[in-house]
């Protein structure tokens, strides 16, 4: 196990180190088309994407076929659950059939919220996601070939260069211990709230699509897209009313491209809202959000001249 400055660096280390350690097999990385951008960037031009269904889940046989039919596969990557829509992936089923091909698993959104899947070779996580400080962590199973992709450093057994932030690491461990103690009960509470959001939003807001698997998903994430709505305007309207949410389809100033996750799923990419519940999110706050949302959507549609559509 090794620690990094943040979760992105942990994912980079997990992917690049696994590819470097298995260079004799090749340089290709088979991955789902909805992996975190950090995984896609680390794979570079050597990535082999596998399509997902409307819920954002890969087909096990299709994934394994991509591994077996591609020359020079050094590793595979499959997230435990999606960071935008919450859909869980069949990691254990894939891992059981991969043979000697190592499997890198992004568990960033899963740790502290749900049990980890079995079978991973290299696993990466981010302490911020369970309430800790900005610390990334990755673990390599005994016997898995992994080589540091960073310049040589005598510290941390050469895995990660630089001096580890011991204070933050200890704080991250303490936070994880506290979260895991109540993980099951908190997951059940959050799942009930998310189920309410999934049911009420399409009932109160016309032309909306709730995305992600309705059952096999993380307990704290729910995402939906509203037709005839600008995502940034919707987020701003909700922010003014005290609700901090994000948008999986928000464009970056450099690429002006929608979320690759939503595109891969074939989902509506405009007017997207991602809600992530926290341990201190109350039922009353969810009810208030469900009252405010239809009003904000109507206001944004009116501003765009789409209220009569």
Label for each model-derived stretch:
Residues 1-309:
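Pyridoxal 5′-phosphate
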